[in-house]
Design a protein with these regions (language model features):
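Extracellular/periplasmic solute-recognition and catalytic clefts
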Residues: 47, 135, 207-218, 234-294, ...
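A bilobed periplasmic-binding-protein/Venus flytrap-type ligand-binding module shared by bacterial periplasmic
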Residues: 107, 218-223, 279-305, 309, ...
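Detector for C-terminal structural segments
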Residues: 309-343, 400-409, 433-561
């Protein structure tokens, strides 16, 4: 395998290819009827020039999506985000759910011809553990370190071993269905697990890599799945989103994956040369509310008054122009774990309602107004105006969060709440959140692959910036990792269904998530606003996936034709 060579003419050859292709392929009138998929594709990647190609340390969104064509995992997600088999043919649980036994496919080969075994999976997990412990910076650990955790954060898995060539045992401290999500990491060959550009098992293999220019892939003719129709893919590197967008407009690339606000103009385009697909991310934009004792947002009525005053629809249309998905929960709609929120036990219903906001503020005693129209009340220290600190942190190359903060300031002013808006760098903003020195904070959570909100809702969770405390919620979160009740399962039922315990664990996981969603809605510790989306711009339809997800943006391209 060749990894690095000088290939400065790659982009020029690609442009000539597209020019010839444009003369040969007929133009069509609808975005859903664009030209037939060619056997060669060019993908744009925005990434640093010196990026290394190790799949376990890569964190660049575009690069991870491209490497997803080279490397595969034991488990992947379907369109409902349920775990399904990939390199693992099947699995089962033993020891009351604390031992997971994965059966590896016996017909899978690495790109260098060596057969995949369970010992390769074990070696890959060993590397992940070493990465998790070696670096203090999360961005140096890769995307998968929470699988095993470190001294500060508990991992999902305790230990693992290969018991034969095609059997991997994974051991946990407690029964937990989330283990399946944790097993979604790229599998490497034991002999080359620490090497840069190690061979994978995926539908494409790396032909060569010129840092800062081109990552060239060619189809894996010995793939265990269907032989890829698109025989070669060149991923061309760009320094900025604007540079990549310009390349797309110049027809130098066929596919561009981007979260840049500049790509908004392409959304919904009906063209004979362009398709645009929205893709989902794991970034949840929130308005953090300080639940600390003594905070003005400690009272549930105050938090709900603020929530009722915010018009999410207006934020989405005026600021984000539709490149987000509105939510009231911390779980995405359309997934198997999603549960809709109805009317709560006290009659409250999520949604924009300024009349309800005004009524709640009146109940709290903020029923007077100063000469500027802001709410106030008389205290022993005199008249006090209702003033809240609204903070946000900047996102590189993106002013949308600033615009959203100013819109929220206007919305709160409409119900008489005065706010002072302050901007911080990401580092300083994170320090403010951790210290609790804020009233309102416009920020974002990046959720892990494993759907588990313990980190942000448990009383001592490392991401519990709202300083939320609830014994009920803590019990629900702990129950998420407990074994299901098995007393009601008869011996006959156990014999007839060997996977009975796994089914119980799956059903309990969903039920527990529903209870967590309900409790979160009742307590309203912070306000989920929307999930960030991105856009895939393409000149050819390339995917049959309904749920196109960040980090997996090229999934199924090998089978599309």
């Amino acid at each position: 395998m060749r990894f690095i060579r000088n290939d400065t003419g790659a982009k020029k050859r690609a442009s000539v290819f597209l020019l010839l292709l444009s003369l040969l392929l007929p133009l069509c009138g609808q975005a859903s009827s664009v030209s037939a998929v060619p056997a060669y594709m060019r993908v744009g990647m925005v990434m640093p020039e010196n990026e290394l190609l190790h799949p376990l340390t890569a964190t660049n969104r575009d690069l991870v999506s491209v490497l997803g064509l080279v490397y595969e995992s034991l488990v992947k997600l379907d369109d409902n985000q349920q775990p399904v088999a990939e390199l693992a043919e099947s699995w089962e649980v033993q020891d009351g759910g604390k031992t997971w036994v994965f059966h590896i496919r016996d017909n899978v080969f690495f790109h260098d011809g060596r057969r995949l075994t369970a010992y390769d999976v074990k070696a890959t997990m060993d590397v992940i553990k070493q990465l998790a412990g070696n670096s203090s910076a999360d961005n140096k650990k890769g995307l998968y370190w929470l699988l095993v955790g470190n001294d500060n954060v508990s991992g999902v898995i305790k230990s693992w071993e290969a018991t034969d060539d095609y059997t991997l045992n994974v051991y946990t401290d407690r029964p937990y269905y989330g283990v399946l999500y944790a097993m979604m990491f790229p599998i490497l060959q034991a002999q080359s697990a620490y090497d840069e550009n190690p061979p994978g098992t995926g539908p494409y293999r790396i032909d060569y890599y010129t840092p800062g220019e081109t990552l060239a892939l060619v189809g894996n003719q010995n793939w265990w799945g269907q032989t890829p129709y698109i025989s070669s893919i060149d991923a061309l590197c760009y320094k900025t989103d604007d540079e990549a967008l310009q390349a797309f407009e110049n027809e130098e690339i066929d596919i561009l994956m981007t979260r840049s606000p500049s790509a908004i103009r392409y959304r919904g385009v009906v063209s004979n040369r362009i398709n645009s697909y929205d893709y989902s991310t794991r970034q949840l934009e929130c308005l953090m509310l300080n639940n600390s004792s003594g905070s003005k947002t400690r009272d549930l009525k105050m938090r709900r008054a603020i929530m009722s005053a915010i018009n999410k629809t207006r934020l989405i249309t005026s600021v984000y122009q539709g490149i987000v998905t509105q939510t009231d929960t911390i779980q995405k709609s359309g997934t198997w774990l999603y549960k809709d929120i109805g009317t709560l036990s006290d009659g409250y219903k999520y949604g924009y309602d300024p009349d309800r906001a005004n009524a709640l503020l009146d109940e709290l005693g903020w029923d007077q107004y100063d000469d500027k129209g802001y709410r106030c009340k008389t205290t022993e220290n005199g008249k006090q105006t209702l003033t809240l600190r609204l903070n946000y942190y900047n996102e590189a190359g993106n002013a949308l969060r600033k615009e959203a903060a100013l819109e929220i300031q206007t919305m709160l002013a409409a119900v008489g709440i005065k706010t002072t808006v302050s901007a911080y760098s990401y580092e300083n903003g994170a320090a403010k959140l951790k210290s609790g020195d804020y009233d309102l904070f416009l920020c974002a959570y990046n959720f892990d692959f494993t759907p588990d909100p313990t980190f942000c809702l448990l009383s001592n969770g490392y991401g519990n910036y709202a300083r939320y405390r609830s014994d009920t919620m803590s019990s629900l979160l702990k129950a998420l990792r407990r074994a299901p009740a098995v007393d009601g399962v008869t011996e006959e039922e156990r014999k007839q269904n060997p996977g009975w315990l796994l089914t119980l664990m799956k059903n309990k996981f969903r039920s527990d998530w529903g209870a967590i969603t309900d409790q979160f809605a009742e307590d309203s510790p912070f306000l989920p606003l929307y999930w960030r989306n991105g856009v895939v711009l393409t000149r050819y339809p390339y995917s049959s996936i309904r749920d196109i997800r960040e980090y997996e943006l090229l999934d199924s391209i090998e089978s599309y034709r």
